[in-house]
Amino acid sequence: MNQFFTKKMAATSCIIMNTFLLLIHIGLFVFFVYYHIRYMYIFNVFSMVFYACGYFFVWKEMLSQYFQLVAVEVMLHMVLATICLGCGYGFQLCLLGMVPVYFYGNYFSMQVQKKKVHGIFLGILSMILYIVVYAREHFRGPYYVIDDNVQFAIRICMGVINFAIIILCMSLLIRHVIASESELLRKADYDALTKLPNRYYML
C-alpha cells in the first residue's frame, strides 16, 4: 500500500461515502412515503438496512465486496425508481454519476486489499441499464405521476448529487496522481540507503 492509500484513509473515505448514501436513502424514503410510492419505500427500507450494515464491511476491511454491493444497490434502486416515476426526476443520472466511483473503488480496493471491483464491467452495465430505462419509458411510461414542481426539484437535487460525486472522485484521483508523482520523483532524486541526492538529482 502506498502512502496515499493508508488503511485509516480507506476506512475514513468509506465511512463518509456510506454515511452520505445512507442520508440520501433516508431522504428518499421520506419522499416515497409522503407520495405513497409503495414499491420504492419498501425497497428503501432494505437499502437503509444495507447502508447501516455498510459500516460492518468497512470495519472488517471488506472493501471490494462493499463497493460491488453498493454498485448493485444503486443500479437496482435507480432502475426501479425510474420505472416507477420516469426519467423526468433524474434518478437515471446516478447510473452515470456512479461510474467514477466504480473505477475509484477498483483502484482503492487494489491498493488496500489487492482485490478488484471490476470497474469496467460495472460501468458497461450502468450504460446498458441507462439505455434500457429510457427505452422502457418511451414505450410504457411511468407508473406514478407527481406534480411538475416536485419533479423539477428532485431533478435538480439528483443533478447536484451526481456532480458532487463526480467532483469528489476526480479530485481524490488527481490528489493521488500528484502524490504518486511526488513520491516517484523523490525516490528518483535521492538514494534509498544514504538519503542523499543521487546523480539523477544532479541532472
Spans of features found by a protein language model:
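Hydrophobic transmembrane alpha-helices
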Residues: L21, H25, F50-Y51, F57, ...
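Alpha-helical transmembrane segments of polytopic membrane proteins
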Residues: Y41-S47, F152-N162
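Transmembrane helix-loop junctions in multipass membrane proteins, especially transporters and channels
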Residues: V33, I37-M40, W59, L63, ...
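Conserved nucleotide-binding and Mg2+-coordinating catalytic segments in signaling enzymes
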Residues: R186-L203
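Hydrophobic alpha-helical membrane-embedded or membrane-associated segments
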Residues: I16, L125-S126, F163-I167
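Juxtamembrane or sensor-core-proximal signal-transducing alpha helices
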Residues: C157-L185
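Short, Lys/Arg-rich, polar N-terminal cytosolic tail immediately upstream
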Residues: M1-K7
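Hydrophobic alpha-helical transmembrane segments of multi-pass membrane proteins
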Residues: K7-S64, V70-A71
